[in-house]
Amino acid sequence: GYIWHTTGSGKTLTSFKAAQLATQLDSIDKVFFVVDRKDLDYQTMKEYQRFSPDSVNGSNNTDGLKDNLSKDDNKIIVTTIQKLNNLIKDEKALAVYNQQVVFIFDECHRSQFGEAQKNITKRFKRYYQFGFTGTPIFPQNASGAETTASVFGRELHAYTIANALNDEKVLKFKVDYNNVRPKFNYIETEQDATKLIAAETKKTLLHPTRIHAISEYILANFNQKTHRLYGRTSGFNAMFAVSNIEAAKLYYEKLNQVQVDHDKKLKIATIFSFNPNESQDGNIPDEGFEVTAMTSTAKEFLSKAIGDYNDFFKTNFSVDNKGFQNYYRDLAKRVKSQEVDLLIVVGMFLTGFDAPTLNTLFVDKNLRYHGIIQAYSRTNRIWTK
């Protein structure tokens, strides 16, 4: 079954206690906590270690995961869905396949879990599986894919965003719509995709005049939106969600260009990675840490943006896979500590990232259904400074 607990309601702690209690059952041999990406893997490990030091086993690769499975302990095994999938495909006869195991999936709305679940049923003989999600996939927002219930079974418990708002665990969303330039309104409000040629749509949305106008709007309104009217040391920071890598590049360059003469410049950073299927349906794309598949143009821009970051913070990150992972982790810390004012993203950080200092999300991107809730929920944490 699955547990529907809204983002910001303490889902990580609930899932940890569920995993911890499962390890204490005599009938259970192994407990897996499965996340979608290495960033969530790292965050979960840190969170679990905070709750209970030495309670979990993590791994850097499939071989490490295999080693952890051979250990005779009752620690929770934290792994990514990718590592688990690779292990199942490569290893045909592991002892764990015949053991009694529990799988707890975090953010189980993600598309990859459907494939993984099928592979698990092929290999594991005795298992229980539970999914945690803040945004379940229902038939009306499945976009032709499987629903959360079709993969995990029935809903076991629900604590929705309405419950969290009533209990004052999260903040309400305040949404402001801004028409930047009237000449572009028709393209921004057109709902019938058949009336638009994709190339023309992209060309219009990335038009230099539009990019410039939106960049000026963000810079002009940043202090008011983030409550920094009385100085940069107070208030919050912001995220800017854009449609694709090309948009991230254009906005990064234009924002820095427009503020070049400002006395107090925003510290702007960006992060993205390769996503083979650019989302047009309002879902947030699942970006991994693989940068090798990027186009040379995208990689060149990312390298420059990381270089700017290195210059500002006296760091030494790069676009190779390990350097990129370290950049991600350092960037996450600096966003949480408000050392970064504005973070431009395509898909990364829009799900599973918890930063109470973040109160504003600028959006120039198609978001629908659970994609909206996931993205907006980056801003509704309660922060007691």
Map each language-model feature to its residues.
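Walker A/P-loop
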Residues: 1-18
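Short basic/glycine-enriched coil/helix segment immediately N-terminal to the Walker B
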Residues: 70-73, 88-101, 323-328, 332-340, ...
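Signature of the SF2 helicase/ATPase Hel1-core->accessory helical subdomain module
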Residues: 85-92, 96-199, 212, 350-385
